[in-house]
C-alpha cells in the first residue's frame, strides 16, 4: 500500500514503523477495498486471472510462470516494486546427524547446485553468484534476475517480528469494517 502511495521500496519499513505510516497505508487500502479479491491458496491467483475475475493479482511468481509456460496463459509478470521473500533452512538444536546436515547445506550452497533450482521452478537461487550458472532462457523468469532487481522490497522478518502482531490486528479490524 505504501509503495502504491509513492513510498520508495527502501523506505517502506521506516515509514510503516510509525503510526502515521500505518495510517497512510490503511488510507491507501481504503481506496481499493471494494475492488480487492482475497486469495488464500497459491493456485488461486492464476485461476482468478484466467477466469477474468481479476485483472491483476499478487502471486507466487512460480505459479504464474507455470501457467504461462505449461498452460499458455496470456499473463505477464511485472517485476517493478516486487516483494522478495526468502525461505530458510535450519538445523534443529539437538539434531541426530548435524554433520550430515552441514554437508547438505554446504552442497546446496554451491552456486552451480543452487542454480539448478531454476531448472525445476522459477524461484530464483538464493546466492547472487549462482545467476551465472542459470540457463539463459530461465534467467528472465526469475524474480532475482539482475534486470528485475532495480525496484524491489525485501520482506523484513525483524520488522514483522517487532510490528507484525499489531499490524495484523489492525488489518483484521480493517477487513471487518
Regions found by a protein language model. Name each.
Residues 1-76:
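Ligand-binding pocket segment of bilobal, Venus flytrap-like solute-binding proteins
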Residues 62-65, 82-84, 96, 112:
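Solvent-exposed loop/turn segments at secondary-structure junctions
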Residues 28-31, 70-95, 137:
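Periplasmic-binding protein-like
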Residues 47, 148-177:
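Conserved C-terminal helix/tail region of periplasmic/extracytoplasmic solute-binding proteins
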Residues 87, 92-152:
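Mature extracytoplasmic/periplasmic domains
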Residues 2-7, 30-34, 50, 54, ...:
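Sec-exported extracytoplasmic/periplasmic mature domains
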Residues 20-27, 31, 40, 44, ...:
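Extracytoplasmic/secreted proteins, especially bacterial periplasmic and envelope-associated proteins
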